[in-house]
From Swiss-Prot:
InterPro entries for the chain: Aldolase_TIM, DapA, DapA-like, Schiff_base-form_aldolases_AS, Schiff_base-form_aldolases_CS
Lineage: Bacteria, Pseudomonadati, Pseudomonadota, Gammaproteobacteria, Enterobacterales
Reaction catalysis annotation: L-aspartate 4-semialdehyde + pyruvate = (2S,4S)-4-hydroxy-2,3,4,5-tetrahydrodipicolinate + H2O + H(+)
Species for this entry: Shigella dysenteriae serotype 1 (strain Sd197)
Entry protein name: 4-hydroxy-tetrahydrodipicolinate synthase
E.C. numbers: 4.3.3.7
Catalytic residues as annotated in Swiss-Prot or TrEMBL: Y133, K161
Keywords carried by this UniProt record: Amino-acid biosynthesis, Cytoplasm, Diaminopimelate biosynthesis, Lyase, Lysine biosynthesis, Schiff base
Length: 292
């Protein structure tokens, strides 16, 4: 469940900015049918930053309910205060989710020792498997391989989503962790190369709109068929890139609407609707991928 193509799913909203249950069900059904390995609910792409804690928990639980055992659900539970991250994580104890994706604290930029103590404290307050999430381009904080190696010794810290796009990190981390420590790319552009170096899969934005292709690419990679996987990846490469032509999740939410997967591309401020030029750029990438 922690390998292959795991989607960082969008949180669909109605025109008033409320979570749209019908669109969420449609998305989940799409991922079940497409072979997606698991869903990350309310991560960065799921607009965690603009949901309050009650809404955050409600969306995760709604996702779990609508999935109904058909696909594993991972909860995004990161926060920049350790006590807050613990509180959010504990909401999902005994809920049925299979694990938590926990981003490094953002804005306050802790030291490596602070990061170690932060993640260790969270893990000690739950039995849920914990996946570390390193995305310094968003957080201003880089979880270094040496710290990952220390954290990998904590019993329920089972993997990392490594979103630096720096492929040297794969081997650096592999040298410091056990073979069963899960290495997931958080960068669609370099995900296939990441897997060829020994990674186990990707937590993907592209999978929101190209779920079957991403699942097949990851399956081929896991089987060692990298030439075939690369054919799929090259077709998706413009999409990997152009889904970030404006801040995530603006482009991917619009793409979901364009493909009829959600009813609206509504976002909450300070996120704003996609621009006309962004729309045309993403539409061209969708066509290149064979999705339009």
């Amino acid at each position: 469940m922690f390998t292959g193509s795991i989607v960082a799913i969008v949180t669909p909203m109605d025109e008033k900015g409320n979570v749209c249950r019908a669109s969420l069900k449609k998305l989940i059904d799409y991922h079940v049918a497409s072979g997606t390995s698991a869903i990350v609910s309310v991560g960065t792409t799921g607009e965690s930053a603009t949901l309050n804690h009650d809404e955050h928990a409600d969306v995760v639980m709604m996702t779990l309910e609508l999935a109904n055992g058909r696909i594993p659900v991972i909860a995004g539970t990161g926060a920049n205060a350790t006590a807050e991250a613990i509180s959010l994580t504990q909401r999902f104890n005994d809920s049925g989710i299979v694990g938590c994706l926990t981003v490094t604290p953002y804005y306050n930029r802790p030291s490596q020792e602070g990061l170690y103590q932060h993640f260790k404290a969270i893990a000690e307050h739950t039995d849920l498997p914990q996946i570390l999430y390193n995305v310094p381009s968003r957080t201003g904080c880089d979880l270094l391989p040496e710290t990952v190696g220390r954290l990998a010794k904590v019993k329920n810290i089972i993997g990392i989503k490594e979103a630096t796009g720096n492929l040297t990190r794969v081997n650096q981390i592999k040298e410091l962790v056990s073979d069963d420590f899960v290495l997931l790319s958080g960068d669609d552009v370099s995900a296939l190369d990441f897997m060829q170096l020994g990674g186990h899969g990707v937590i993907s934005v592209t999978a929101n709109v190209a779920a079957r292709d991403m699942a097949q690419m990851c399956k081929l990679a896991a089987e060692g068929h990298f030439a075939e996987a690369r054919v799929i990846n090259q077709r998706l490469m413009p999409l990997h890139n152009k889904l970030f032509v404006e801040p995530n999740p603006i482009p991917v939410k619009w793409a979901c609407k364009e493909l009829g997967l959600v009813a609206t591309d509504t976002l909450r401020l300070p996120m704003t609707p996609i621009t006309d030029s962004g729309r045309e750029t993403v539409r061209a990438a969708l066509k290149h991928a064979g999705l339009l």
